[in-house]
Swiss-Prot record:
Catalyzes the dephosphorylation of undecaprenyl diphosphate (UPP). Confers resistance to bacitracin. Keywords: Antibiotic resistance, Cell membrane, Cell shape, Cell wall biogenesis/degradation, Hydrolase, Membrane, Peptidoglycan synthesis, Transmembrane, Transmembrane helix. Its main location: membrane. Pfam families: BacA. It is found in: Cell membrane. One of its GO terms (molecular function) is undecaprenyl-diphosphatase activity. It is a multi-pass membrane protein. The chain crosses the membrane at residues 14-34, 40-60, 79-99, 112-132, 141-161, 182-202, 217-237, 242-262. Its EC number is 3.6.1.27. Coiled coil: none annotated. GO terms for cellular component: plasma membrane. GO terms for biological process: cell wall organization; peptidoglycan biosynthetic process; regulation of cell shape; response to antibiotic. This is Undecaprenyl-diphosphatase.
Length: 265
């Protein structure tokens, strides 16, 4: 892997982890489009740990308040949010533990299938953004809503769905304001990224030193770009909603289809 490839993939991860466009789909599709070799599991760990750092740094004050209040005052506004995040994390973590390897094997080189998923979820995102009645603030959400958002996160294993996309969309369907749906999606991302990243890192810890340069580049790039992506999305949803990301999904699906057909000839 070249330095340029490490930076480019770090940018894709930083954007795709927090924007509703699917980081996993981008990390599969773009190396295929450019004819690059598959990146290693160690590098994949670096990318995810980078985005973990991004969300922890961006929301560090929120996380500090949430953890302290969750332990000291569990019935307070921030205290409830602590337990809501835990409730929302369990379904995705369980589903990932049981089925992640199976899903990865099925979707590994199914580029046309990924294009279809990107487009279909693009339509869903567009439709929900158009019809959802967004009135509920983050402080007014309940444990039932948190649980449903957590269950929806399980579907993010499928490349093209997007963890942030499916959780934000579910939040919108449940009546959360767009900013609230986005913020809860970001806040609940840390435990799932931390868990998955820690497990993968422990499995591949012996290979880190051999790939340290690319590991560091991918980590740093995804962290910086991820931080900027969070800021960008929180700003744009207030003005334009999520439709712009649906349009991008349609465009990328069309590009994948075109390349797939050209290479099949």
């Amino acid at each position: 892997m070249t330095t340029f490839q490490a930076i480019f993939l770090g940018i894709l991860q930083g954007l795709g982890e927090f924007l509703p466009i699917s980081s996993s789909a981008h990390l599969i599709i773009f190396p295929w489009l450019f004819g690059w070799k598959e990146h290693s599991l160690v590098f994949d760990v670096a990318l995810h740990l980078g985005t973990l750092l991004a969300v922890l740094v961006y929301f560090w004050k929120d996380y500090l308040d949430i953890v302290v209040q969750g332990i000291a005052k569990p019935k307070s506004e921030k205290g409830k949010l602590f337990w809501f995040i835990i409730v929302a994390t369990i379904p995705g973590a369980l589903f990932g533990y049981l089925f992640e390897n199976i899903v990865e094997e099925v979707f590994r080189k199914q580029y046309l299938l990924i294009a279809i998923v990107l487009a279909v979820f693009g339509f869903i995102l567009y439709y929900v953004d158009s019809i959802a009645k967004n009135k509920i603030e983050l402080s007014k959400m309940n444990v039932f809503q948190a649980a449903l958002i957590g269950v929806s996160q399980a579907f993010a294993l499928f490349p093209g769905i997007s963890r942030s996309g499916i959780t934000m969309t579910t939040g919108l369907l449940l009546g959360l304001k767009k900013e609230a749906a986005a913020k809860f999606s970001f806040l609940m991302s840390a435990p799932i990224i931390l868990g998955a990243g820690a497990v993968s890192l422990l499995k591949n810890i012996n290979h880190v030193s051999a790939e340290f340069s690319n590991f560091a580049i991918g980590f740093f790039t995804s962290a910086v770009v991820g931080f900027l992506a969070i800021h960008f999305l929180l700003g744009i949803v207030k003005k334009s909603g999520f439709k712009i990301f649906a349009y991008y999904r349609f465009f990328l699906a069309a590009v994948i289809l075109a390349f797939y057909l050209l290479r099949a000839v």
